[in-house]
Every structure is written in structure tokens, then in C-alpha cells.
Amino acid sequence: MAARNRPRRSASTAGTSFIIWTDEPADREELTTPAPDVGTRWQAGRVTEFVKQDFTGARFEQVDFSRAWFRNVYFTGATLRGAWLEDVDIDGEIRNVRINGVDIVPLVEAELNRRYPERAKLDPADADGFREAWTVIERVWPPTVERAKRLPPELLHERVEGEWSFIETLRHLVSATDAWVRRAILGLSEPYSPLGLRHDEAEPDPSVPNDPDARPSLDEVLELRTDRMHTVHEIIATLTDDVLAGQTDPVPAPGYPPAGSYPVLRCLRTVINEEWLHRLYAERDLAILERRG
């Protein structure tokens, strides 16, 4: 699974593994879902998967989560006491996260802005700010694409640790632009490319093309990307503060996002956020693929 956007309540948590131990000797039995009631003692169990489960309010004590994998999960309001975090990799949206009494969010934000000075421009509030932000997006993507072109073509379809391949990443960005720009802002009744790829946890929708098994060439996807990025460029080039502060006109046809009126700022900010984050993920995975190639 590759969707690296902010988690959703309906997200699939495929791949999440919990290893639950007690001090009591017992045969190893595979854990089953749904989740145990709070306070229930579970004997040693083999690795299992919990998918689309609700653990709200659950209590885990003397539990071994070593090498566990959490994807598209909510930890809002979670409390960890006496936790041992070592060699832990966390990637996600963080707000009001305190470790040993210290809110780490400002520290993480400052370090990310130090590593990527242009990142500070990617949360615009006015039309000129959006023009600056889109200029950043247009500048950072070409070197990433050139890096991908140096790999054997088959590696561009290869996933790294279950994350989207490079071509799947580009397909998803086409889908994001089709949804939030071509449909929501431009009001097109049929905005979608058949090669677009929605986030993995999206519910099936016959009105939105989504073929995870498609294997288009890099050139095919880049042609689509060029067209979609040009569309965004044209919209932002003529954007005014009044338009940015307004709402989109609802599109009556079924599709995604659902028919309704959306803040123009939200639509454009979503696309910019997707473009920025997925390029970082692509760069990370390209480095691994380069070692394989």
C-alpha cells in the first residue's frame, strides 16, 4: 500500500502485526479478531494481522510490538507509558506529540525546513503564495524523473516495502489532480484518466476509474503528468485572492470527491501537498532501487 496522504478513518491497516505475550506458559495460538476486550489476558501468539479494526480505548500492557508494522492508523489521544522506542521509524501527520514531556512537533518542523528550505513556501494562504509554491513543485520534480529514467524500466514498476512503485506514484498524482482540480475546480463531469490510481484504501466506485493492475510505460504516464501539471499551472497563474477564498461549484455527476462545494484553497493545497510528499517518498525509494539495479 502506498497512500502516504493523511490517515482516514476507513483506511485499511493491512500489514499491521501485533505480537502479544504474557508471562504465563502456553501453546502458541494465532490471535483472532475482533480485538480483545480491555483487560483480557492473551497467551503468546504468532504474528497476525488486524485489518480495519477499532481499538479505541483498548489497553495494551506488557506487550511486545517489536518489528510490528502499522500503516494508515490513528493514534489520536493515545498514551504510551514505560515505552521502549529503539530503532523506530515513524512517518505521518503529527500534532501535539510529546515525548518525555517535550512537544517534538516544532523540533521536527524546524529540522524539515532546514533540510528543505523551500518547504516553508508550501503552506500558502494567498494567490501569490500559491504561485510560489507551484513554482517549487515544478522545479523539484524534473530531477526526480531524470533519476528514475536511469533505472531499468522493470524497476519502475517495483514496490519498496509495500509502497507504491515510481509509476504508481505518478499515476496517483494524476488521480489527485483529476479529482481536486479537473473535477472539483473545473467542474468537468468526466475528469478522470483510466490510468489514474486512487489511494489503496479507497472504497470501490464505478464512476472513478481505478486499475491497480495496469502497467503503463513511464512515457505514457509522463505524458499525462505533463498535461495535468500544465492545467494546475494555468489555474494558479491567473488565481486571485477572491477566487482562492471562494468555493467550487458542485458537480452533480457521481465521482470523487463527492458532489458538493469545496474551498478552492483546500483543493489546491491538497494537490501541492500530494506533489511534495510523494516526490520525497519517490526519492527515498529510488535510492533503494538504485542499489538493486
Protein language model annotation of sequence segments:
Residues 3-21:
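Low-acidity, Ser/Thr- and Arg-rich intrinsically disordered low-complexity segments
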Residues 12-13, 31-32, 282:
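Short, linear, compositionally biased motifs with a strong N-terminal bias
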Residues 143-151:
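Long, well-ordered alpha-helical segments
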Residues 133-140, 144, 173-176, 217, ...:
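Alpha-helical packing segments of well-folded alpha/beta enzyme cores
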Residues 31-114:
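Tandem repeat scaffolds
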Residues 107-133, 181-229, 289-293:
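Short, helix-capping/interhelical loops that line the mouth of catalytic, cofactor-
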Residues 26-27:
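Short, low-complexity, charge-dense intrinsically disordered segments
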Residues 153-208, 230, 247-293:
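Short, contiguous alpha-helical
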